[in-house]
Amino acid sequence: MRKLILLLLFIVPFFSWGQLDSSKKYSVNTIAFYNVENLFDTINDPKTFDDDRTPKGKDKWSSIIYKKKIKNIAKVISEIGREISNSGPSIIGLSEVENKNVLIDLIKSEKLKKESYGIAHYDSPDER
């Protein structure tokens, strides 16, 4: 019995040793995915299926509508994860984006420009 007690007194401190270092600091980062539902610019591109979202298209897609959509999406993205972090998401995946130019407009918007986001973009055909 005495040997068991001595053994426990010797082993237990090693198991709790790692828990003594309370100086470790952790940061929380947010990763998000957002379907922005047809983020198109107003320029008609014959290589894409954007005819509805042009000034002459069925949706009468204007610069005013485009800028408002950019502003609204930027606001939502900037608020993702704010309850647990002091910044917006570290990584964001977006779908239904027409081209790289709309992503550039989005990250240059008032709500997102301070985050210094970069862009990794791939064009893929969408033949709806």
List the model feature ranges, each with a label.
Residues 4, 127-128:
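Short, solvent-exposed loop/turn segments at the edges of secondary structure
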Residues 16-110, 116-127:
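N-terminal, active-site-proximal structural segment of metallo-dependent hydrolase catalytic domains
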